[in-house]
Every structure is written in structure tokens, then in C-alpha cells.
């Protein structure tokens, strides 16, 4: 039924807090339940605005305290609670308001008050026997809403009133780092060892976030440090992976197994090494971590530290006895990995751990490549220098019989070619195709390298298996300067 002019006047008076007009209109017989086009009554407007005297007057004149607004299904009590109007709430409850009425979303006045964090309104509703464990259509309770809002006093009041802390609320509080709320939830019966949909416990979640105070609260409540998630991760491996030093220390102190492996065989020490977190690596080693443990790919903590280039972690691991010669499943050693990446400082540290006469270590191959040939190919001049000074054989051949010198010629690395020659590289060795370093230099048109090779006694007229000489290769590629240089040095047609 559309509102009359008199109804509209009453609604306007209630909206603006005009007590005199409200009294006058009611005295004329205007309906106390007057409502606008959306179904909002004068009582609802007065309640949400906090006009307590108008609320009292309307109720005294028969206004329906439980009238439901057409839009969203709200009541005056819900509106008053949502707008923190404690006096309105008190009057409405005294007037018989249904404290557990639900709106279209299944929310109650208590949920609205919990969302807004008004402890006074919450207490009024609880005293009126509001249901603390009812949930809305999303499955959210007043306690969950209060925890999400971060209002400690409201959470405590709900807990004291018997609210049950389902575990989703605990995970929510942990993710937000709300230590005080977490403590309350645990006291309300939340299980610190329950797993979420990702099979992680609250302790694991706190370890990922790195919140030490939350970790300490959970541990004090009996959180189990040894629980695994679906990937075999524990709170400790996760904390190490995310680099949270204080959390790792706390978990180790609580008895966490430092050598436990995840589904891939990874350990906390490997995670610390891969992340370059020296303090965590130190804590774990002091707690007895197996320094040479291997994952399913036969990677070790040292392998990870070398791969990522963390010099300080590599130094620590070497001092503590990490194996420098262990190969992973692909056949790589720490030396090979350091060489290909040009990690000169790490390479030096590795070389210091072995005797220069240890040819098996220095010249170890993977897919026919040595540390030297890999470093040469990548153009890491300083790395090549360190390797040569460390005793590697400059003449060990790699893939297809190519020596480090040949690779330097192919890639045009002049300084490296000079280093190799000065370190005793044989300029006349042949690869599987019968080619010499000079032939490769001629094929690439590397004038400066050719000069180095000639000065080192390179044989000018050797032929490869295709019966080509260095001069022929230069002529074929129209390298006029190279042709002239070779002929001047004595190369024959």
C-alpha cells in the first residue's frame, strides 16, 4: 500500500529526529508503522539514526518492532546494531524485538554488531540471548565475522558466551597475524592441529607468514611440529623456504626434526641453501642437519647454494664438510655448475677443498664437458683463469673432441684463448672432425686469435677429415685479412 502524505511526514520527522512533529502526527492518528516505497518504517529510520526518544514514542504508539523491510529483509534491530546505536538496541529489545531474526542473507543483528566491532551493542544482544553460533548463507558466524574484523573485545565476548571456533576462523586469524584473537579462539576450542583444504595446519600457515608471536601461541597450545602437508612439507621446511630465521629457531627449539624430507626429498637445509639464508643454514647445521642429504634428483644443499650463487652459504657448507664431488641425477658437480655460471669466488672455494693432483675432480665431465670447457664456452675469463691456476688440464677434450682452446676459437674469446695458450694448451690437437684450433679460428675469421695461435706454433697446413686447411676455410668464407695473415705466416694453397 503506497504511503500517504501523512505517512511521508512521519517518516521525514523520524529521519530528522523531530520529536515534536512525530508526537503531533501520531496524535492525529498517523500510522506508527508508516513506511516508504522500500518498506523502511519510521521506527527503522529512528533506530538507525539513534533517535532513542522517537524510538520509544513509536513503540509506545504500537509500531511493529519486528517489521521486516522489503529491501534486504532488515529489521529495526539489525539497522540499529549495524549503526552502533546502543540506546536504540536497548529500547527495541525491551520492546520485544526478535534478537535472532535473519535478513535475506541469513545475517542477524549480532553479526552486524560483530562486523562493526561495537562491544556495547554485542553485549546487549548477548544478554538478550542472541544465538552466537548461527551462521549466515555463506556459513559465517558472528565469531568469524568478528575475527575477520579484528575486534578482540568482541571475539572474547562471543567466546565467553559459548561461540564455537570452527577451524576456518583460526586459519583466518593466523593469516592476518592476530595473535590475541588466535589465543581466544584456541581457548574457544579451535584445534591447532587441524588441516585446511590445502592440508596445512595453522602452524604451517604461521610459518609461511613468519609471525613468531603466532608460532609461540600455537606451540603453547599444543601445535604438532611434525605434521606433514600433502607435499610432505612441515612447518620447519616451510619456514626455512620462506627465510624466517626466528621462526626456524623457535621450531627447532620445539623439537622439529631438522632432517625430515618433503615428497621431493628436500630438507630444510636445502631450502635455506637455495634461498641463501645463511642464519637459517647455521641454525640447522648446529641442530644436526645432514649436510650431504640428497633429494630425489640427488641434489644437495651445496648444489643448491652453488646454483644460486650464494657465496656465504657455500663457504659455510664447505667449512662444515659438504661433499664437493657429489653428482646430481643429471651428472653435474658443484664445480661444473659454478663454472658454467661463472661464479669465480665459489669456484675458488671449491678448488681449495681438493688437491691440485685430484684429476678426477678437476677434470670431471658431464655430457662430455668439463668445468673448463663450460667456462670457456660461456666466456667467463676470470673463471677460466681460476680453473687453470687450480690445476685443471687445458687439453682435456669435450664434446666431439673439442678442447677448451677450440671452443675459445669458435666463440671468439680472445683473452681466454691467450690464457689457455699461456697455460700450456696444445695448439695442434685435433677434434673428431680432424680440425685444429687454427682451423676453427680461420672458420670464424678471428684474426687476433689466429695471431696468438701462429705465435704459439700452430701447424699452418694441417688438413681436417674433409681435406680442408685453415687457409681453405678462410678463403671459402672470404676472410681476406685472415687469408693474408695465414699466407704471410707460410700457409700453402
Language model segments and positions:
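Ankyrin-repeat-protein effector appendages
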Residues: 1-9, 156-169, 175, 188, ...
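N-terminal segments that cap or nucleate solenoid repeat domains
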Residues: 1-41, 45, 181-194
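Start-of-repeat signature of ankyrin repeats
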Residues: 6, 39, 72-73, 106, ...
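Eukaryotic tandem repeat interaction scaffolds
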Residues: 366-369, 373-378, 382-385, 389-418, ...
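Ankyrin repeat structural motif
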Residues: 18-26, 52-59, 85-93, 118-126, ...
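Ankyrin repeat boundary/linker residues
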Residues: 3, 36, 69-70, 103, ...
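Ankyrin-repeat inter-repeat connecting loop/turn
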Residues: 32, 65, 99, 132, ...
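Ankyrin repeat A-helix N-terminal signature
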Residues: 12-17, 45-51, 79-85, 112-118, ...
Amino acid at each position: 500500500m503506497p504511503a500517504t502524505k501523512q505517512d511521508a511526514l512521519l517518516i521525514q520527522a523520524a529521519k530528522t529526529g523531530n520529536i515534536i512533529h512525530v508526537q503531533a502526527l501520531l496524535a492525529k492518528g498517523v500510522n506508527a508503522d508508516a513506511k516508504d516505497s522500500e518498506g523502511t518504517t519510521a521506527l527503522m529510520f529512528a533506530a538507525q539514526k539513534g533517535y532513542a526518544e522517537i524510538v520509544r514514542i513509536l513503540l509506545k504508539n504500537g509500531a511493529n518492532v519486528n517489521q521486516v523491510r522489503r529491501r534486504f529483509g532488515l529489521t529495526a534491530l539489525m539497522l540499529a546494531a549495524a549503526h552502533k546505536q546502543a540506546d536504540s538496541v536497548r529500547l527495541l529489545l525491551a520492546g520485544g524485538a526478535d534478537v535472532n531474526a535473519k535478513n535475506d542473507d541469513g545475517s542477524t543483528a549480532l553479526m552486524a554488531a560483530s562486523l562493526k566491532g561495537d562491544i556495547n551493542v554485542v553485549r546487549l544482544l548477548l544478554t538478550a540471548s542472541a544465538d552466537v553460533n548461527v551462521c549466515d548463507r555463506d556459513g559465517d558466524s558472528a565469531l568469524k565475522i568478528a575475527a575477520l574484523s579484528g575486534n578482540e573485545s568482541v571475539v572474547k565476548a562471543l567466546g565467553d558466551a559459548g561461540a564455537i571456533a570452527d577451524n576456518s576462523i583460526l586459519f583466518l586469524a593466523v593469516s592476518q597475524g592476530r595473535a590475541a584473537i588466535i589465543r581466544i579462539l584456541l581457548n574457544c576450542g579451535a584445534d591447532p592441529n587441524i588441516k585446511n583444504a590445502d592440508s596445512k595446519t595453522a602452524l604451517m600457515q604461521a610459518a609461511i607468514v613468519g609471525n613468531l608471536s603466532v608460532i609461540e601461541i600455537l606451540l603453547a597450545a599444543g601445535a604438532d611440529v611434525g605434521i606433514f602437508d600433502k607435499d610432505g612439507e612441515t612447518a620447519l621446511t616451510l619456514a626455512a623456504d620462506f627465510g624466517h630465521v626466528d621462526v626456524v629457531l623457535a621450531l627447532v627449539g620445539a623439537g622439529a626434526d631438522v632432517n625430515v624430507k618433503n615428497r621431493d626429498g628436500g630438507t630444510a637445509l636445502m631450502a635455506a641453501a637455495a634461498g641463501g639464508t645463511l642464519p637459517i643454514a647455521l641454525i640447522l647445521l648446529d641442530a644436526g642437519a645432514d649436510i650431504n642429504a640428497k633429494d630425489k634428483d640427488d641434489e644437495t644443499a651445496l648444489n643448491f647454494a652453488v646454483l644460486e650463487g650464494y657465496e656465504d652459504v657455500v663457504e659455510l657448507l664447505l667449512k662444515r664438510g659438504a661433499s664437493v664431488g657429489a653428482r646430481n641425477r643429471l651428472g653435474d658437480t658443484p664445480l661444473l655448475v659454478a663454472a658454467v655460471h661463472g661464479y669465480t669466488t665459489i669456484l675458488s672455494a671449491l678448488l681449495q677443498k681438493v688437491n691440485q693432483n685430484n684429476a678426477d675432480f678437476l677434470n670431471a665431465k658431464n655430457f662430455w664437458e668439463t668445468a673448463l670447457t663450460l667456462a670457456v664456452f660461456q666466456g667467463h675469463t676470470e673463471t677460466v683463469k681460476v680453473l687453470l691456476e687450480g690445476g685443471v688440464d687445458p687439453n682435456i677434450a669435450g664434446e666431439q673432441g673439442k678442447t677448451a682452446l677450440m671452443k675459445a676459437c669458435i666463440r671468439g674469446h680472445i683473452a681466454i684463448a691467450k690464457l689457455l695458450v699461456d697455460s700450456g694448451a696444445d695448439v695442434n690437437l685435433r677434434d673428431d672432425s680432424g680440425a685444429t684450433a687454427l682451423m676453427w679460428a680461420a672458420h670464424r675469421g678471428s684474426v687476433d686469435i689466429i695471431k696468438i695461435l701462429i705465435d704459439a706454433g700452430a701447424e699452418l697446413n694441417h688438413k681436417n677429415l674433409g681435406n680442408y686447411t685453415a687457409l681453405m676455410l678462410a678463403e671459402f668464407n672470404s676472410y681476406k685479412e685472415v687469408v693474408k695473415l695465414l699466407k704471410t705466416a707460410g700457409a700453402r694453397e
